[in-house]
Amino acid sequence: MKKKLAIIGAGIAGLTLANLLKKNSNHEFMVYEREESLSLEEGYGIQLATNSIKILNQISFDKINNEKIFHPKTIEFYNIQNEKICDLNLSKFNSNEAKYTTLQRSTLIEFLKEDIYTQHLRFGKKMKEVSELKDKVLIKFDDNTNDLVDFVIAADGIFSNTRSFFEKKKNEPRFKKAIAARVILKSKSEFDINEENISLMLGSNSHIVLYPINKKKELNMVC
C-alpha cells in the first residue's frame, strides 16, 4: 500500500533517504527544511567509509565527478611532535565498487539534491505542532502550512526540533567542553606528512586530523 512520508531535515541523511525512496519505491514523500536554502558554499571535509559508499552507490554516487573526491589508502598516526606511531591500511576494506572516500560536504549535498530539489524539497518549514489523526500524523509548520502523513522521519541533526515532539523523555546534547576548528588548506601544508593519506596527530588533550578532499590535493584540517 502506498504511504506518505515527511522527512524533516535536508542534510546528508534526509537527502540520502529521499533519493533511495525516489529510486526504489512508489511512496509519496516530501523533505522539509527549516532553513531558507541549502548551504552549498565550500565547507568542511567529510570521510565516507565503504559501508556508506555502498548505500550511496544505489543512487549513482559512483557517477560523481572523480576530480571532486579522493580515495586515501592509509591512516597514519603521529604524536604531537609529528613522529609516526603506526598506520592502518584502508585499502583492505575497499572493493572495486566501494572505496573509502573523502570529499567536501558541499560536494555530497550538491549530488544528493540533484533529483530532489524541484519536486520533493520545501524550505522555511519549521515544525511547531504534531498530532495524531485517524492513524496518521498531522504536522503543522510555523508558516501556517500543514501536511497529513503516515510516517515522520526525523533527520534534522543532534539539535533536532522534530525529536522533541515524539520523545516522552526529553534529551538534550551535553557540552563536553571540547570544540573543533575546521579549515581547508588550499596550498601545501607545513606538516611533514604524506598528503595522499589521512594523518591523525595525537596530543594529550587534543588532536589534529588532515586529509585530502579532492584531486587538487586540498586538505581538510580539523583540530
Question: What are the roles of these predicted feature ranges?
Answer:
Residues K2-L5, K22, A49-I184:
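Conserved N-terminal helical subregion
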Residues K3, H27, V137, E195-E196:
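Nucleotide donor/acceptor-binding cores
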Residues K4, H27-M30, E218-M221:
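Residues at the starts of beta-strands that form the adenosine-phosphate
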Residues L20-E42:
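Glycine-rich FAD pyrophosphate-binding loop
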Residues E196-C223:
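Active-site substrate-recognition segment that forms the wall
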